[in-house]
Amino acid sequence: MTKKYEFDWIIPVPPELTTGCVFDRWFENEKETKENDFERDALFKVDEYGFFLYWKSEGRDGDVIELCQVSDIRAGGTPKDPKILDKVTKKNGTNIPELDKRSLTICSNTDYINITYHHVICPDAATAKSWQKNLRLITHNNRATNVCPRVNLMKHWMRLSYCVEKSGKIPVKTLAKTFASGKTEKLVYTCIKDAGLPDDKNATMTKEQFTFDKFYALYHKVCPRNDIEELFTSITKGKQDFISLEQFIQFMNDKQRDPRMNEILYPLYEEKRCTEIINDYELDEEKKKNVQMSLDGFKRYLMSDENAPVFLDRLDFYMEMDQPLAHYYINSSHNTYLSGRQIGGKSSVEMYRQTLLAGCRCVELDCWNGKGEDEEPIVTHGHAYCTEILFKDCIQAIADCAFVSSEYPVILSFENHCNRAQQYKLAKYCDDFFGDLLLKEPLPDHPLDPGLPLPPPCKLKRKILIKNKRMKPEVEKVELELWLKGELKTDDDPEEDASAGKPPEAAAAPAPAPEAAAAAEGAAEGGGGAEAEAAAANYSGSTTNVHPWLSSMVNYAQPIKFQGFDKAIEKNIAHNMSSFAESAGMNYLKQSSIDFVNYNKRQMSRIYPKGTRADSSNYMPQVFWNAGCQMVSLNFQSSDLPMQLNQGKFEYNGGCGYLLKPDFMRRADKDFDPFADAPVDGVIAAQCSVKVIAGQFLSDKKVGTYVEVDMFGLPSDTVKKEFRTRLVANNGLNPVYNEDPFVFRKVVLPDLAVLRFGVYEESGKILGQRILPLDGLQAGYRHVSLRTEANFPMSLPMLFVNIELKIYVPDGFEDFMAMLSDPRGFAGAAKQQNEQMKALGIEEQSGGAARDAGKAKEEEKKEPPLVFEPVTLESLRQEKGFQKVGKKQIKELDTLRKKHAKERTSVQKTQNAAIDKLIKGKSKDDIRNDANIKNSINDQTKQWTDMIARHRKEEWDMLRQHVQDSQDAMKALMLTVQAAQIKQLEDRHARDIKDLNAKQAKMSADTAKEVQNDKTLKTKNEKDRRLREKRQNNVKRFMEEKKQIGVKQGRAMEKLKLAHSKQIEEFSTDVQKLMDMYKIEEEAYKTQGKTEFYA
């Protein structure tokens, strides 16, 4: 069964606050009238939910402070204006120190610059201390800023109830103002009357009259939720006035559930769970009894915490906090002290408080030598005409606020331009104000050794780390000992410390050009480079001559000049870190993106805005989050889109300022390219569809509104300024857009992607926005509550949207995916399709025959497979080349034999003549007994035998040579034939690849034409993205085909070459057999010992 998530957003409010206490209140503001600057004896209370601090005094209107906008409650506070101080002291006495102990300052704001200070004077110091403690307990309630629309309606009703006039009653006109931006005044007051409330403009009503049920009914009367009614009708199909249990189960599983989720870990909705939901939100007892949901119950469900747009458990600590520091994104600020522009801007201690209270965990201090007799170190933007603040005041503010909103470590990024004497003061103030909060030594189990990772955030809770240049350990040790003995000279050697300097006098020198300032800032941050060197004459970098005490306080954040990724790998020192201006960081990212990601797995990097951003604008942080950069520091004073992305992202994981990077950006065995379009190994790409249906309470004016939906993530996932609804004119209350869904077809990396809703007036002015992480997004019909530009919650403004989430499926694989996801359903659909085809007279066989015919036609186009005849001795003997050699050999043998025959004839004649001469005139008996004749015959026999043997040898030698020549000729012919076969196969393979490339080119052209003619793609960017996606899929498919062809061709070639090798082997064996035969015959002839003669 699907588990119910209990979203407990209420922090119990201490009874002391709900009971209330009488305080005096004073307010120091030029806009405030003199009558309002001091209020006596006001009863202050906090409501039971911890939404508001509200008060009312005799003869004055009631007022409220929304506690989600309260950033701090501070002890003390006395008026600077003498007139207000006079009023305060007349009522509370002239003992200012005692008065200060009884006072509290409540800071509220809707951005980080414009702070409103509410000062109250308590009856005594104990009450002040108790209220400060208790109020701090219920502020910074991250859950309360994410309550559902129905609770927000209740919250607004409570605000109206507390904003009473002098008589203690609620003005009807303030209620009417809630709905004035979309309806006529007459209609609003008519609806108020129908709700049973006074309808006169000047009328008032008691709290007892103005119940929440009446306000909720009035809301639905003035703003009828036709959008929800249409959805209700689509579920019931208009047949009844309720949703049955079966229909509700189907709706929850089909529409309200992410189909990508594992059904074991996240089971489907079933009868028991859906019955629980109906019982929770249905008020009609009869329908509840019948397990049915009415339209009213359906509205309550859709506007409840049960139906939040994101998984609400992500607001709590849900990430592991025991990984090395380098494995986390860290909420970071740039030039924290500035409340305005970078040049000529105002420096403010308050900015340190506000950024830390907002969850920032890395703040920057640009430290310079102080002026005047006390020479107190100051913080300012050097050479930029900015005002100055004292370093010790900044440190005090940091000590006060570092761990109010988060217990996880704070990193102080020092840009140190002070001489050694003043650096001693820097170290002393840090030691004095921070005490045990300052991490002065590395943790015992995390020493500063090469190859060891950084400690995890969980081991650095409530610790402050200093990022400042550090001396070499051996030098630091010696100098620290000398300093402790009082023997260290703190006078700076100008030659050794040319970089230390004083902040410029306003009239001393003109401000540097933005480019020079940027280059110099790069040098100060450790960026270096030619531009930095050129600017160094006018803009000094951080000092390298560090005081040993300050140096000894630096441990896990030791800045060094970046020397390249290879050098960083070689050193392998995790506690070394480098800072990069956004432009330098972008260059490294473009040139060595994978190396940059791997660098950030091991050690930390800090990115800061380039110096040309004089207006304190921000760069897009997403680019550097994609590379795994930890400290992507931004100008918190600018409530622009980059800051919205930053604060929207860091709202999750308890708002602690630390977010664990995705797994593949932490693992050493994984490489990740942030510019890749292809899916990441082990990560399933997603498809997201967003339909903007309607808005509620978008503006308090009758203006036209429209909504933009953007996505930010990897470059391939980022889609901005493309999806925009139509403009709904003159309705800021409840515009209905009902647009076609905006489809983000392929989200390669959902873990890094965020969805942004932006609501704008027709003039382009932003009315509200919301950042939602894609990995925590819930599918279905949801209400998205909006935030201000500075990401502060807005109670009533919201959008009603339908979000669909799917696994991304490339074109052509939809059926395959459907079959894998639901085999039975797919089989049933196929069967139904076949039955429908039969009903149309189309038999399955005919379709099969058509497919077979098409397949046969396709095969006809294909060339028949190559079949090579085996190369044998017989086939080679038929070759002309071999026959030519054979004829030549026959001729040579014939010539030799003729020569031998001629010699035999000549010898024969000679021997015959000699015998005839010897036997002439003799009888047979004489001849038989004549020794001379016998000797002559023996000599002739030997001569003839030797000649015949020689002839035979010469013939055998020629035959053997002929066999060798034939072997060589055959081998050459065989290699030629084999080479021809290989060439024929290579040509065939080349033709196959050429045909494949031609097919790819044709498909690419067809795809371009198809995308161009696709009417569903509205914008050029959408068409370009779709075309790129299709072409990538085509290329991937063709590369796979090419790979398969290559494998197939490789096998064919290997098979042919193996056959050739076998043929050569068989040929050599046959030739050797022939040679052996000749040799045996020759040896046999030699062993016979024949004596030959001619008779």
UniProtKB/Swiss-Prot annotation:
This protein's UniProt keywords? Hydrolase, Lipid degradation, Lipid metabolism, Sensory transduction, Transducer, Vision
Which PROSITE patterns does the record associate with it? C2 (PS50004), PIPLC_X_DOMAIN (PS50007), PIPLC_Y_DOMAIN (PS50008)
Provide the C2 domain boundaries: 666-794
Bias (Low complexity): 500-523
What is this enzyme's EC? 3.1.4.11
Q: Where does substrate bind?
A: 467, 469, 579, 606
On assembly, the entry states: Interacts with inaD.
**Sequence ranges assigned to domain PI-PLC X-box in this UniProt record:** 319-469
Enzyme class at the top of the EC tree? hydrolase
User: How is this protein annotated for GO cellular component?
Assistant: inaD signaling complex; rhabdomere
- Per its record, what are the GO molecular function terms? calcium ion binding; GTPase activator activity; phosphatidylinositol-4,5-bisphosphate phospholipase C activity; phospholipase C activity
| Family annotation (SMART domains) | C2, PLCXc, PLCYc
For this UniProt entry, which residues form the secretion signal?
A: none
**Catalyses which reaction(s):** a 1,2-diacyl-sn-glycero-3-phospho-(1D-myo-inositol-4,5-bisphosphate) + H2O = 1D-myo-inositol 1,4,5-trisphosphate + a 1,2-diacyl-sn-glycerol + H(+)
Q: Which InterPro entries match?
A: C2_dom, C2_domain_sf, EF-hand-dom_pair, PI-PLC_fam, PLC-beta, PLC-beta_C_sf, PLC-beta_PH, PLC-like_Pdiesterase_TIM-brl
Give every PI-PLC Y-box domain span: 550-666
Compositionally biased residues, Basic and acidic residues: 852-863, 1007-1030
Example GO biological process term?
release of sequestered calcium ion into cytosol
Q: Which residues form the active site?
A: 334, 381
Protein name in the entry: 1-phosphatidylinositol 4,5-bisphosphate phosphodiesterase
Please list the tissues where expression of this protein has been recorded. Abundantly expressed in the adult retina.
Q: Where is this region: Disordered?
A: 487-529, 842-863, 1000-1030
SUPFAM superfamilies per the record?
A: C-terminal domain of PLC-beta, C2 domain (Calcium/lipid-binding domain, CaLB), EF-hand, PH domain-like, PLC-like phosphodiesterases
What is its biological role? The production of the second messenger molecules diacylglycerol (DAG) and inositol 1,4,5-trisphosphate (IP3) is mediated by activated phosphatidylinositol-specific phospholipase C enzymes. Essential component of the phototransduction pathway. Essential downstream component of a hh-signaling pathway which regulates the Duox-dependent gut immune response to bacterial uracil; required for the activation of Cad99C and consequently Cad99C-dependent endosome formation, which is essential for the Duox-dependent production of reactive oxygen species (ROS) in response to intestinal bacterial infection.
